[in-house]
Amino acid sequence: CRFCVIPETNNLKWRSRSAIHVVDEMEYWLKKWNIKEFHIEDVDPTISDKRTQEICLEIIRRNLLIRWKICSGTKVETIKSEKTIELMAQSGCRYISISPESGSSKVMRLINKPFNYQHAVKLIGKMNEVGIFTQACFVLGFPGEEDEDRKLTRKMVFDLAKAGVSEIALFIVTPVPGSDIFE
């Protein structure tokens, strides 16, 4: 997305840790300090359904009685299947933040952000069914955004609330050095 600084700070690379390594770390904190809740702040933790499912299955296999949350606003399009949502819930996931950013297709093009509304509504329904709370994040004030765009965003906020999203987070765009939008 044009407002994100991550591509600049990571040299356009995303490096994943293996499912085993991720769960090893969770198990370490659980056993060493009795930490039972983990907030995942990965740039895009669900980028691979296979990897997400492997992490969930490993948590289940080890019988780790933990809770975990995806707090960083993941791209809903990266969660490909309802099976992934089911495994996430079984492994202790209780919260997923998604990032529609705007209800305006014009603004979405301006910020280079895809969002599949129908897929989001379907997954929100599944998340509700399995006990995962959901948050939808929106960003206001993008350069080129007009009143009509904000009205479309407001409509999407209400539509997602009706679809069952648990909470809405509103942010003001901040042009951070290193992001496209700053330039």
Per-range role (PLM):
Residues D49-K50, K106, L110-I111, L140-E148, ...:
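Flexible glycine/acidic-rich beta-alpha junction loops that bind and position SAM and/or redox cofactors
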Residues F3, V157, A161-K162, E167:
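Mixed-charge, polar/low-complexity N-terminal
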Residues C1-T134, K155:
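Radical SAM [4Fe-4S] cluster-binding motif and immediate context
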Residues I132-F138, L160-K162:
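Conserved beta-strand->loop/alpha-helix structural units within folded catalytic cores of enzymes
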Residues Y95, C137, T174:
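Short glycine- and Lys/Arg-enriched binding-loop motifs that mark or flank ligand-binding interfaces
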Residues T84, G144-A161:
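Catalytic cores of alpha/beta
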Residues H119, M156-D159, V173-G178:
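C-terminal, active-site-flanking charged/polar segments
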